[in-house]
Amino acid sequence: MVHFDRHGGRIWAEPRGRALGYHWPQYSIHRGELQMMLLDAVRARLGEDAVRTGTVFEGFEQDGTQVRARLLDRASGTAETVAADALVGADGLHSAVRAQLYPDEPAPLWNGIRLWRGITEADPILTGRTMVVMGSNATSKIVVYPISMRTERRGRALLNWAAEVRLADDRLDWDPDWNKAGRLEDVLPYFADWKYDWLDFPALMSQAAEILEYPMVDRDPVDRWTFGRVTLLGDAAHPMYPIGSNGGSQAILDARVLAHELAASGDAAEGLLAYDKARREPVNAIVRACRDMPADRVLHTVSQRAPQGFTSIEDVLSPDELNTISGAYRQTSFSDVEALNSRPSYTAAR
């Protein structure tokens, strides 16, 4: 990962995955491809009818032995009640399960940033595997990174890009929706001159087949996910700003820990409580941290001190400041590497 100012000046770089010392690589993958991989795996293990679509969750009741979910088939209008040992609400930012658990919760909180995202096939940038972060979220910022090894093998890159713009008007005038279509003419003016020897960002946006637009929102952390035989997972449990690749990654970790605790406990209610205990506080800390990331503070400082760009980052940040950035990063990263590499697997004993 390499951080640049808005003019293309290199600020600092951070290794990732095996380059940092982890036992495992770091992957960036198309969300739809990952979802289809998971769908295929679920059907292979649980049967073709294990996943149902077009069904609306309308509520639940529970007692000491089971939970009953009320469902509605969108196409036929048929109502149905399904009983189970546990109910996991993994239904996103507008979670209906969470709404029943927290009926008085206010609307999602917006930080004033509007975000446009797209995917474009293009020539590789920098090493071909680099994640680029450029600009400042105090004004405008972009993130670009490759998400397909198949495209890489053809000498091309499938680049996922995000463009952030902080607006003067902090009123959220539409309902947050991860699938709202965006318009090139709305975002292009903010980045019309973001062109560099190795990246033409206006062209990258213009060549995307589809653009999505949404506000950067989260919710305040809650002090409980699990209620008896019902729990929350992913954005339903901890919606956070999409910073640091944490949104989807934390949902995957939720699922991994949940599966481990359910298998280890042998009792659904106990497993849900153990999952809540293991995950909630660490993830709530990430939700709060995403509101004020140290990396974003550095990018903002550079943009304030050198609004027209710089020749050398040493002219903008003092040696002590650079050492503080790299030292804090190393301390956090390498301690995490050691802990993760030595931690027992979440795979439950069979």
Question: Which residues make up each language-model segment?
Answer:
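Conserved N-terminal helical subregion
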Residues: 1-102, 106-119, 170-173, 180-185, ...
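Short, flexible helix/strand-to-coil boundary loops that buttress conserved ligand/catalytic motifs
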Residues: 14-15, 101, 202, 244, ...
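Glycine-centered loop/turn positions within well-structured domains
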Residues: 58, 67, 95, 140-142, ...
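Histidine-centered metal-chelating micro-motifs
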Residues: 95, 115-117, 139-143, 237-238
